[in-house]
Amino acid sequence: MTNRDEIKTKLRDNFAGRIVRKDLTKKIKEGANVPVYVLEFLLGQYCGSDDEEIIEQGINKVKKILSDNFVRPDEAQKTLSTLRSKGFFTVIDKVTINLNIRKDRYEAEFSNLGIKEIPVSEEYPEKYDRLLCGGIWCIVQLEYEYDEEDKFSSPIKIAKLNPIQMPHVDINELKEGRKAFTKNEWIDVILRSIGMEPDQLNEREKWLLLLRLVPLIENNYNLCELGPRSTGKSHVYKEISPNSILVSGGQTTVANLFYNMGKRTIGLVGLWDCVAFDEVAGIKFKDKDGIQIMKDYMASGSFARGKEEKAASASMVFVGNINQSVDVLLKTSSLFDPFPVEMGTDTAFLDRIHCYLPGWEVPKFRPDHFTDDYGFITDYSVSYTHLRA
């Protein structure tokens, strides 16, 4: 039995239903407009076998579930019309549950369907606590019944709700399963879980790819990665974790990033585990004090707005391209050359970066760098990165 086969056997024995063959994700993702973590959860449920016939049946089952039940935002009204005419309909959507204190009841909000204040049984938030913490994707059986005598109540009712993301986090399950693996085996599992094939990487390259995950795990960790194109610098923050956001290069504002004083609402740093800036060369604040506020936040995890001081835990990541060799760059300028001048030459800003990941040491990705083997379903692995230190 090869090392890969041993790892696969250990994964099946200790994490059944939590793993997926990563090539299946690529196979369906091309034609499915759903988050990777939702897709992989379904694949983990229906395609956890080595039997190609069972896998094919599972793929067809997942495709049918998505085509029949996934709600596209532009088809929300069509779905609601079908629900009204049939009296029942099953949908896949991101559901958030809030406690309405005034009415002393729990209410559900559907992201793509665009409806909210739908009464829901308290058994669901008690059973699946992530519904209360930003919401999770679910498959929901809806019923429609209009009551002439009570025109103010919602005609839409939730008959049944099943999460298609990890509904809660059991750290003890992970700890127990981890004991079956050596350190090197566990590193390979993590890399395959983010879609990479460790057999195509040397030891140094493995650790550099793992380093990209640190801002998702640590609070207030500031990372910079500059390097050639096609090395997947922004992929982790865009596709791998639902708890991070990728801000494309361009103008941003203090209100958007930190705190909106008009609306009295926290910005991105208070809503996400990690805020990543793509193409650092284009970062520009509309506000004159934007960079100073960013430096304060990077140093202490807090910032002042008006009379108040706000704290947040989001890590910051800066990624960008270096279009010339490192040797030339060092002779003519510095390794921070791609940054805007007001950031790249400000030693106070540079001192606040905890780690510079040398992107030129990461190989340009070829098809064989992407794994076809088993790894954790994305939502399972990121559930634990969300338990931040």
What are these regions (language model features)?
Residues 2-193:
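Extended, charged/polar low-complexity intrinsically disordered regions
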Residues 331-359:
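A short helix-turn-beta junction within AAA+ P-loop NTPase domains corresponding to the substrate/partner-engaging
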Residues 190, 197-328, 333-337, 351:
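Conserved ASCE/P-loop NTPase catalytic core
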Residues 362-372:
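Short acidic, Gly/Pro-enriched loop/turn segments at secondary-structure junctions
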Residues 356-363, 377-380:
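C-terminal structural cap/anchor segments
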Residues 372, 380-384:
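Extended alpha-helical interface modules used as scaffolds for assembling large macromolecular complexes
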Residues 385-389:
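Conserved small/polar residues in nucleotide/adenosyl-binding loops
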Residues 182, 186, 286, 290, ...:
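Helical mechanochemical/support elements of P-loop NTPase systems and associated helical scaffolds
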